[in-house]
């Protein structure tokens, strides 16, 4: 299940957000933005962009695999060489440098663009439209306020904490 996520798309969407000068672009904001992109895309196009699974966290929806990778970076954990998360981590680090910033009560990750440019050919035009819509809507917003917006979404509000946020769409023909 772990290798189904499209890390190249995740890395590229972070590059796109850096290019668009999204404010307060920490690991937390990236996590919430990924959820909103997948949620919106699923709602309107009936498929996810990143193939990630999201769980309801205490403060916001958490992308399971991406959050795990961010925790590994934040805690400077060493992975065994046969750990498949190494491949995902490498894919992310091929595109971005990640700066670990120790705050008083938590660790924050900031993303730094390297040589790689955003590759829009990885996304179809509907995906680009969804990504652009979410980025434009939340470009200036703090992660706390975006998280609050997530809790206005019924499926997020009604899912118990720690459970997978399941999307069920009924099509009436």
PLM-predicted stretches and their roles:
Residues 1-173:
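Domain-edge interaction signal
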